[in-house]
Amino acid sequence: MTLSLPQQGRLRAAVECRRITRRFAGQAVLDGLDLDIAPGEFVALLGSSGSGKTTLLRTLAGLEPIDQGQLQVPSAMAAVFQEPRLMPWKRVWRNVALGVRGAGARERAEAALEEVGLAHRLNAWPGTLSGGEAQRVALARALVREPHLLLLDEPFAALDALTRIRMHQLIIRLWRVHTPAVLLVTHDVDEALLLADRVLVLANGQIAEQLPIRLPRPRQASTPGFQALRARLLQLLGVETEAEPAVDISLPLSRTASR
């Protein structure tokens, strides 16, 4: 097993996985998996429950060891999970500044909170936040570290539909500004198509399929090609579908040009 954490300037890719294997009780959850993610690329990962999506993300984050293979990731990375995981005894800005070293920690935390629209909540207690606000704090906590790799483990799954749309808009805007590579783990095919440059399907411990998403941004379900990609991904996931009318779930953005 080789685990390498080179400096970002020496990386040709933000993520390089070569034949990585991770076993639990003798069962290979990741089984000789290969994966590359380019700097600044937004990748979504789909798969059935138990397919190993979260295991892969936790492996990239350094939270799970690998049993075999080679893995290269940047030293500057951050993760946002489905649960915000805020410390209730620390005010919002102190949650954002966790792990930030130097005299400017508060200023950096305040700047990150302003980016996610929560400058007015910097002295609030986490228990007073809505679900969407708490996730925005978690996102600010990730961004304050200026990551070259941002890992998102179903961060929008527990949010209501309107808040999810707003979070989608926010994450795309921040991605365009900060340009990290992003790996989003999700069960939502539409979410993957709305956000990602490339969608991967994980099955049997390996990347079974990958589809480049060349649809113009901002995207919506009625964008030409969206429904065909959706049907293809659902087929790969073993979901039988019938033709349905397109529902407009557009993501209006202030920056409309594609990256």
From Swiss-Prot:
A single GO molecular function term of this UniProt record: ATP hydrolysis activity
Any GO CC annotation of this UniProt entry: plasma membrane
Domain ABC transporter, residue spans: 15-229
Binding residue positions for ATP: 47-54
Record EC number: 7.6.2.14
Membrane topology term: Peripheral membrane protein
Catalytic activity, reaction form: ATP + H2O + aliphatic sulfonate-[sulfonate-binding protein]Side 1 = ADP + phosphate + aliphatic sulfonateSide 2 + [sulfonate-binding protein]Side 1
Localization per Swiss-Prot or TrEMBL: Cell inner membrane
InterPro entries in the cross-refs: AAA+_ATPase (IPR003593), ABC_transporter-like_ATP-bd (IPR003439), ABC_transporter-like_CS (IPR017871), ABC_transporter_ATP-bind (IPR050166), P-loop_NTPase (IPR027417)
One family name in Pfam for this protein: ABC_tran
Keyword terms, alphabetized: ATP-binding, Cell inner membrane, Cell membrane, Membrane, Nucleotide-binding, Translocase, Transport
Chief location of this protein within or outside the cell: membrane
Similarity comment: family membership: Belongs to the ABC transporter superfamily. Aliphatic sulfonates importer (TC 3.A.1.17.2) family.
Entry function: Part of the ABC transporter complex SsuABC involved in aliphatic sulfonates import. Responsible for energy coupling to the transport system.
Assembly with partners or alone: The complex is composed of two ATP-binding proteins (SsuB), two transmembrane proteins (SsuC) and a solute-binding protein (SsuA).
Protein name, as recorded: Aliphatic sulfonates import ATP-binding protein SsuB 1
Organism taxonomic ancestry: Bacteria, Pseudomonadati, Pseudomonadota, Gammaproteobacteria, Pseudomonadales
